[in-house]
Amino acid sequence: MAQGFKPAKAKKAATSPKSGSKAKSGPKRGPRVIAPKKKAAVQAAKTKQKQTASITARIEQEMVSRASKGGPLTIMKKAADGDADDKKKNQNKK
């Protein structure tokens, strides 16, 4: 054949968008790991994780104690006081 002749390329079979592989949505599973060569970042992440865990545990225990007492289950004091005042006003009206 002549120079520069290029045979026709084989066409790919037409695929519908549904048959293609689906990209996973959402974050990846598992904990995020910081490279061990960054000691300061690793240490900061550890302390942040400990603080978060302790704060969460304290809030959960506080909510359990409030639930057992039968009081309002709000974390913010002003909102709890406002709810208690509203309940007292409603009881006085009846």
Curated annotation (Swiss-Prot):
Record-annotated disulphide pairs: none
Matches recorded under InterPro entries: UPF0390
Chain intervals with Basic residues compositional bias: 25-40
Low complexity: bias regions: 1-24, 41-57
One Pfam assignment: DUF2462
Region (Disordered): 1-94
Bias (Basic and acidic residues) ranges: 78-94
Family: Belongs to the UPF0390 family.
PANTHER family: LEYDIG CELL TUMOR 10 KDA PROTEIN HOMOLOG
Protein's UniProt name: UPF0390 protein UM03986
Taxonomic source organism: Mycosarcoma maydis (Corn smut fungus)
Species classification: Eukaryota, Fungi, Dikarya, Basidiomycota, Ustilaginomycotina
